[in-house]
A protein has these predicted regions:
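Thiamine diphosphate
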Residues: 1-13, 23-214, 218-219, ...
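Generic alpha-helical secondary structure signal
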Residues: 2-5, 17-21, 50, 174, ...
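Intrinsic-disorder/low-complexity detector
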Residues: 1-30, 34
Length: 313
């Protein structure tokens, strides 16, 4: 009681926050924005789900404090999409293990583990069920650095399969990026191909802020999303969009599964179409977007979501 009373008196005696500091400590103030391109001598072509597996494998070897857990991620199953297959055998049940079927528990325990110095990389089996962990994400994960004035951090990675095109119906096809892009303090990656997925996930595993890593399950094994595999040194910083193809008549801004659909839609239009793959939704690469619009003066935003109020809106 004496300690609590003393802490309360100390808090009461502190000056009011400076309004000029209101935007500080949402994220770590410094971030490595240097970009590394895939080497010319990249390896064999791999599909997106295998690039996720390889990125996790390399980062587990890189950081002995990294742990992976979620529903059915351990053992021979390696998750419903096999993204973690083989990692339990390689790193042991103490570092790759199954969790209860409880998203709030998965995310809540990750907050605690991160506070102890671990690097939790958790899998939410389907984005459609992440809502059970919404309180933890909104009020704990995304705000940890801000509400502690930079003294604490919550550097967890939440891997979340999202999107349609797998006959998953209403409970296995949801697009959730618009909801989470609204939250300050949460980075969001959304790759469209295997090389970007590997580079972004490896970078996410080394960042000091919380990451929501969205993986479109309709792209996991598609040939058009496969890429020559970058080596273990490839890190792709957040906030660096990719010019998929250059053009002068109109700009298409897109991400995830709609990148390939935009390429196909533009093919026979007779127009010179520039296509931008955002790669990450937060941070958003406004520099690349504005540079393109200065050239084309026209824009189409192509995104997979409900009709109203998606991230593209």
């Amino acid at each position: 009681k004496e300690q609590v009373d003393g802490d309360a008196e100390w808090a009461e005696a502190q000056p009011d926050p400076n309004p000029n500091d209101k935007m500080k400590n949402i994220f770590l103030q410094s971030r490595d924005d240097s970009i590394s391109e895939p080497p010319a001598n990249a390896g064999e072509k791999i599909v997106l789900v295998d690039s996720i597996n390889h990125a996790l494998d390399e980062e587990m070897a890189h950081n002995e404090l990294m742990v992976i857990y979620g529903q059915d991620v351990a053992g021979d199953k390696g998750g419903v999409f096999t993204a973690t297959r083989g990692l339990t055998d390689k790193y042991g049940e103490g570092r790759v293990f199954n969790s209860p079927l409880a998203e709030s528990s998965i995310i809540g325990t990750a907050v605690g583990m991160a506070s102890l110095g671990y690097k939790p990389v958790v899998e939410i089996q389907f984005g459609d069920y992440i809502w059970y962990g919404m309180m933890q994400i909104r009020n704990e994960v995304a705000t940890m650095r801000y509400r502690s004035n930079g003294k604490w951090a919550c550097p967890i990675v939440m891997r979340v399969p999202v999107g349609g095109y797998i006959h998953g119906s209403i409970c296995h096809s949801q697009c959730i990026d618009g909801y989470f892009a609204h939250l300050p303090g949460l980075y969001i990656a959304y790759p469209s191909n295997a090389a970007d997925a590997k580079g972004l996930l490896k970078m996410a595993c080394r960042m000091e802020d919380p990451i929501m890593f969205m993986e479109h399950k309709g792209l996991y094994r598609q040939g058009f999303a496969a890429s020559p595999e970058p080596d273990k040194n490839y890190l792709l910083p957040f906030g660096k969009a990719r010019i998929v193809q250059e053009g002068n008549d109109v700009t298409i801004i897109t991400w995830g599964a709609l990148v390939q659909k935009s390429i196909e839609a533009a093919r026979n239009t007779g127009l010179s179409v520039e296509i931008i793959d955002l790669r990450t939704l937060n941070p958003l690469d406004m520099e690349t977007i504005l540079t393109s619009l200065q050239n084309t003066s026209r824009v189409i935003v192509a995104h997979e979501d409900n009709l109203n109020n998606g991230f593209g809106a």
